[in-house]
Amino acid sequence: VPMFRRLPVLAGATVLLFTTACGGGSAPRPGERTTQISDPADVDAQAAALLAEMSLEEKVGQLLVPVLSGTTAEENAEVIERYHPGGFIYFPENLETPEQVAAMSNGLQERATGTGAGIPLFLGVDEEQGLVSRLPFGARFPDAMALGAARDPELARELAAATAEQLAAVGINLDYAPVADVNVNADNPVIGIRSFSSDPELVGELAAAEVAAFQDGGVVAVAKHFPGHGDTDVDSHTGLPVIDKSRDEWERVDLPPFQRLVDAGVDMVMTAHVLMPQLGDAEEPATLSPHLITGVLREELGYDGVVTTDALNMEGVRQTHDDGEVAVRAVLAGADQLLMPPDVDLAYSAVLSAVEEGRISEERLDESVLRILRLKLRRGLFDAAPADAEQAAQVATQPEHHEAAQRVADASVTLLRNTNGVLPLARTATVHVLGVGAEEIGAALADLGLTVTDSLSGADAVVVGTDGARGDAEQQRLVARAQASGAPVVVVAQGTPYDLSVLPDVDAFLAVYSTMEVSRVAAARVVAGEVSPSGRLPVDIPGTELGFGDGLSY
């Protein structure tokens, strides 16, 4: 697929580069990561030259990142031509096969670079791995908290490098990851296992390893959700969380990972729809707060990269202003990109009118557009080769990625209770498996030589899978029914390890922090003694004596 890229020369004029999928010379090959520009002077000069060619409407468009429609570029052509968006975000309904996504990405970039100023798109996705994973193909890694239990930055790097390779192969150049939130609230309904840990230093270390690997792979990394979403008991998708903690506590708990990532040069920071009154703004959520975005993030932390809002279709940011006003206030607060506005036309028109009327100065608009252009230049978007469908399919089935996912899962399994040494089970044992993930756990145990029975009576042990049992009476009753059989009960917690606080009397308790198949296989390997548990608790468990760093081994 031939693709045109308009690039400025340093004198301020433009040249038209022609790259093909199979050309000679210096043109990149399909799927190849392009050379990223590292000289800040070159980036600044080229960004300024591009900006000078853009119309006001094109500048405003760069701030918009709508949701994609359908599974083809053609279905989004009108949005590109009318609004000149800075990017799009993929969701599962847009993603079918590697070949289809590669073709869609190529088509979107062709449309964008052939329209107006010819600025390539950020094509993003929420691919945190684990619970928040959009790709229906490729290796499925465990959640971030599994990495927190494994305590190995190299495993975090492997996860991010594999993810970046999978994304780049299908033309996705931005990942809304990693989560830099410090999960200190056991009742957090939206973060939980998406967080590495309750320990700020460990969160920062693992998030930094992921950021470096994403960006080394040519994929934009996004630290989220500033100023911190780890101490909420309200989901900002459905309401506005209020975190009433002091500035001192915030600096001690929530700030360190973000400061570390800012210092490390993270490409992008995502704001949170949370209200933190003691940080200096009791009226607006962080996404709409000039004090928190411009004052704290930019001026105090020294961040000059791209700031994106969290999705603007979430209730946490829509409770006090209409959707057009939300978009305007986010820009005034210091945001550069408006993610998923519920009405693209309304957001575009509101920001454009605010600039035309002088409420948003054109200088302020230019600041955001320059940040966006600089990042697109640094990550090589202007000379990116088209995604190659055949290569994309190969990357999606790459065995090295699946092996890495299993290594992460194996290293994360945390044994928190083992009464009378019930684990490991003998390979001759008969086991009944029920609850969350029973089919996959049972199959893995059978593969290891244990006999898996459909009958609860007569089993040598009962394995019960849970996920969120702390807040689910039905799961608690299921464990009680297993205990009533008289056989030893082994719980495999596949969400947060907080389930142990409501299951204090089980014989053995394993935390695997993920419902991914590799985590269920890892649990079976530990139950059968194939692997010795080496994970350590990355959080404290309320109502128990178990806390950060605890974990048993064989």
Stretches with model-predicted labels:
Residues 79-98, 176, 186-187, 262-283, ...:
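Short acidic, glycine-rich surface-loop motifs adjacent to enzyme active sites
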Residues 1-11:
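Bacterial N-terminal signal peptides that target proteins for export
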Residues 121-160:
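Substrate-binding cleft of extracellular glycoside hydrolase catalytic domains
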Residues 4-5, 16, 22-83, 299-300, ...:
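Preference for extracellular/luminal or secreted protein segments
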Residues 145-172, 179-211, 398, 504, ...:
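A substrate-binding/cap region within the structured catalytic cores of diverse enzymes
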Residues 55, 75, 96-117, 131-133, ...:
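Second-shell residues forming the walls of enzyme active-site clefts
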Residues 69-72, 94-97, 127-132, 174, ...:
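Solvent-exposed loop/turn segments at secondary-structure junctions
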Residues 61-68, 86-90, 121-127, 174-178, ...:
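Hydrophobic faces of well-ordered beta-strands that scaffold small-molecule active sites
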